[in-house]
Amino acid sequence: MKRPDLSVEIAGIKLRNPVMTASGTFGYGEEFAAYVNLEKIGAIITKGLSLKPKAGNPTPRIQETTGGMLNAIGLQNVGIDAFIEKKVPFLRTVNTPAIVNFFGNTVEEYAELAERLDKIPEVAGMEINISCPNVKHGGIVFGTEPKAAYSVVKAVREATIKPVIVKLSPNVTDIVEMAWACADAEADALSLINTLTGMAIDLKSRRPILANVTGGLSGPAVKPVALRMVWQVAKAVKIPVIGIGGIMSGTDALEFMLAGATAVQVGTANFLDPAASERIAAEMEQYLVNNGITDVKELIGALQV
């Protein structure tokens, strides 16, 4: 039997396999190049970018939890100018699509970032992090209010011809309503879930462990929530969905595809095993071989309910 076809396509971006790296867990790609063959994964999604460099939150900002981790890094990044000057040259050398995750404090900032990224040939597409407060409108998080999400996505859509993926926050009452708002604003694809908001407490000091008090929960603990949300959203929209949340193995990744995801992102697993994304892609291929499946696309949305 010839090797199964693991290739998928997201909004015109051709991936050799469905495994992408999740933003914030893989640096800008170069940091992991010594541990992972970057040409054995589907795409690299870079650490979230902002217009200006960002120092992030004070420490402590990471805490291990049962079945996962809490992070309050605070979107620390080099800023768009340093990204173009120092990070893009490496991406030019890699034969794997690079998708740039970015965020802003206002609709205008999102649009400006999209406009600048649009001009960089090495950027195959963009992933918008809408889990940020809108500083012009009382700090409401863009990703928790459909109209706010629509306005950001629409502004980005008008600023670029490159594929636009929107990363959805799970900290909402109705994830489908948010998905519809982004699809209506002409997003090309949706990725979900971002982290769930959580906290950890030190009983001895009676204080929060994280300096920021709350942080984002990720890892295996969130996988059942992520699977459910991916399943709901994939049924509700016509654009591709990318599954994120606690993916540690090829089995986990394939479950997300059955739920309706076209591709997946590996995040927290990268901290435990720097080669996780490559290993997960290999495990997916082995499953297809073992089960006589010739094309991974046969599994997308094949959940029998």
UniProtKB/Swiss-Prot annotation:
Alphabetical list of Pfam families matching this protein: DHO_dh
Pathway annotation: Pyrimidine metabolism; UMP biosynthesis via de novo pathway; orotate from (S)-dihydroorotate (NAD(+) route): step 1/1
Protein name as annotated: Dihydroorotate dehydrogenase B (NAD(+)), catalytic subunit
Known cofactor(s): FMN
InterPro entries with a match to the protein in the record: Aldolase_TIM, DHO_dehydrogenase, DHOD_1B, Dihydroorotate_DH_1, Dihydroorotate_DH_1_2, Dihydroorotate_DH_cat, Dihydroorotate_DH_CS, Dihydroorotate_DH_I
Active site: C132
UniProt xrefs under NCBIfam families: PRK07259.1, pyrD_sub1_fam
Reaction(s) this enzyme catalyzes, per UniProt: (S)-dihydroorotate + NAD(+) = orotate + NADH + H(+)
Subcellular location: Cytoplasm
Positions that bind substrate: K47, N71, A72, I73, G74, L75, N129, N194, T195
Function: Catalyzes the conversion of dihydroorotate to orotate with NAD(+) as electron acceptor.
Cofactor note: Binds 1 FMN per subunit.
Family: Belongs to the dihydroorotate dehydrogenase family. Type 1 subfamily.
PANTHER family: DIHYDROOROTATE DEHYDROGENASE (FUMARATE) (PTHR48109:SF1), DIHYDROOROTATE DEHYDROGENASE (QUINONE), MITOCHONDRIAL-RELATED (PTHR48109)
One function term, GO molecular function aspect: dihydroorotate dehydrogenase (NAD+) activity
Assembly: Heterotetramer of 2 PyrK and 2 PyrD type B subunits.
